[in-house]
């Protein structure tokens, strides 16, 4: 059975388009082929049938029972050099279910909310580094906040030598992967040859070894000096047990920590940078948001930010208009199925295109416009709005990411007055494994009197 139509260019050329110009590539495919088309991304991603209609996504994401569709970890693609083979993203079947069951508790309820003061403290300290009115890169600032939150809330590190070493090494490694050309070895496995520390792959391997050494040292220290009172995610994972009473191995812990880092650092920083841009690009949005934030009491509980409708709408619209992840996790067809009039056979690989779903004018009128009110006027199904993916492969850190985004924004906006520094038009662009706004700069000063959050 023939697959749906798609670009006729070679898989290498399509992969280069995907790496360098993913947005225009997807839009061009959609204009020519409609809501379903096939792309060929070579050795790292293979052949994918992409769907951008909510009805198709409902079928795909609601049938993850391995009867109609399966989501094998082998489809983790270019992420394996970063996250390893034992993380929740790289596992399948019963192993994947076990990993999710062990990982979910730290990201829900009071455990997650206990991180509010930590997030606020990190945000305050980072923002104060550029006072008064020192221009700063918005995205770099948000990356710093995101990385420090992960090191403290996930890794459980306090400031010290190991913290400083990991911050420097992780920051440098992740920044190097933000260049699509430098990150080429992730997309083309044949480029993974060690020609020394001055070449991209060799440099990556050396930094990864240093990072792994520090992570394994931290795991060993925690095992040797167990402290039940600790609430960081590494401590909770160390004490977690599956249904058989088995704990996570050191390798599993390392891979899960790196997965949480890769999944949570770049995505959260990008979403925060975009939010700051739109809020300050559109004064009406900023003023309305500040008015709502003033209603927060100084002693409000940690979940109060989720009860602010306009803040929630601004965050949702930010994640809609420029989703960090362009596709859902791929699924493999297990049984013959008709999807939107397309016949799919076992072995075909399908994915939902989040970017195109979020740009559908029949779902989101005037989709190019930043309009938080759309999320106040109607409810969107999980197949129309899915910035964190869906089904059994939905991002496990979704609740934490949403909580962090709202807490950071409320802390910045109530504590500081920010303004955009005029420059080139801000556009969305590819950054290796993710997407991000093009560089833009801001300046900040203390908001007086300071509003407590």
Q: Residue ranges of each PLM-predicted region?
A:
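Cytochrome P450 heme-thiolate "Cys pocket" and heme-binding signature region
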Residues: 84, 258, 263, 302-306, ...
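Cytochrome P450 fold signature focused on the C-terminal beta-domain
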Residues: 226-231, 290-308, 321-342, 351, ...
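Cytochrome P450 catalytic-core helices
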Residues: 267-286, 290-292, 399-414
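Conserved cytochrome P450 K-helix E-x-x-R motif and the immediately C-terminal K′/meander segment
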Residues: 15-37, 213, 217, 300-340, ...
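Cytochrome P450 heme-thiolate monooxygenase catalytic core
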Residues: 1-4, 68-79, 95, 111-270, ...
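Cytochrome P450 proximal C-terminal region
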Residues: 30-31, 123, 171-172, 294-296, ...
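Conserved cytochrome P450 K-helix/beta-meander segment immediately N-terminal to the heme-binding cysteine loop
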Residues: 352-378
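N-terminal membrane-proximal hinge/A-helix region immediately C-terminal to the signal-anchor transmembrane segment
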Residues: 1-84, 89-98, 113, 117-125, ...
């Amino acid at each position: 059975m023939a697959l749906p139509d798609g670009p006729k260019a070679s898989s290498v050329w399509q992969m280069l388009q995907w790496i360098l110009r993913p947005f225009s590539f997807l839009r061009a495919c959609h204009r020519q082929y409609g809501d379903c088309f096939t792309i060929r991304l070579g050795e790292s991603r293979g052949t994918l049938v992409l769907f951008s209609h909510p009805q198709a996504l409902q079928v795909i994401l609601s049938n993850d029972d391995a009867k109609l569709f399966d989501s094998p970890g082998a489809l983790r693609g270019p992420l394996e050099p970063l996250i390893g083979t034992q993380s929740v993203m790289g596992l399948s079947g019963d192993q994947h279910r076990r990993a999710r069951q062990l990982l979910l508790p730290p990201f829900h309820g009071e455990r997650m909310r206990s991180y509010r003061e930590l997030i606020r403290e990190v945000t305050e300290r980072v923002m104060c580094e550029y006072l008064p009115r020192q221009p700063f890169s918005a995205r770099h600032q948000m990356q710093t906040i995101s990385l420090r939150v992960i090191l403290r809330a996930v890794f459980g590190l306090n400031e010290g030598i190991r913290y400083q070493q990991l911050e420097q090494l992780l920051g440098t490694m992740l920044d190097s992967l933000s260049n699509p050309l430098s990150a080429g070895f992730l997309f083309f496995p044949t480029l993974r040859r060690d020609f020394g520390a001055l070449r991209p792959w060799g440099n990556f391997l050396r930094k990864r070894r240093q990072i792994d050494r520090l992570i394994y040292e931290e795991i060993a220290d925690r095992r040797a000096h167990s402290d039940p009172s600790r609430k960081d995610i590494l401590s909770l994972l160390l004490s977690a047990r599956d249904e058989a009473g088995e704990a996570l191995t050191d390798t599993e812990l390392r891979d899960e920590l790196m997965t949480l880092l890769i999944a949570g650092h770049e995505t959260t920083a990008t979403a925060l940078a975009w939010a700051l841009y739109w809020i300050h690009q559109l004064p009406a949005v900023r003023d309305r948001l500040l008015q709502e934030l003033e209603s927060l009491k100084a002693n409000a509980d940690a979940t109060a930010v989720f009860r602010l409708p306009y803040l929630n709408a601004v965050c949702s619209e930010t994640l809609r208009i420029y989703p960090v992840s362009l596709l859902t996790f791929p699924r493999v067809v297990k049984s013959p199925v008709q999807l939107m009039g397309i016949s799919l056979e076992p072995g075909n690989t399908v994915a939902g295109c989040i970017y195109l779903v979020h740009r559908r004018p029949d779902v989101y009128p005037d989709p190019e416009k930043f309009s938080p009110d759309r999320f106040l006027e109607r409810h969107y199904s999980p197949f129309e709005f899915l910035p964190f993916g869906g089904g059994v492969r939905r991002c496990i850190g979704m609740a934490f990411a949403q909580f962090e985004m709202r807490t950071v924004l409320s802390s910045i906006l109530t504590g500081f007055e920010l303004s955009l520094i005029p420059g080139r038009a801000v556009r969305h662009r590819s950054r290796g494994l993710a997407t991000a706004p093009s560089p833009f700069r801001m300046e900040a000063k203390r908001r007086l009197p300071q509003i407590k959050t």
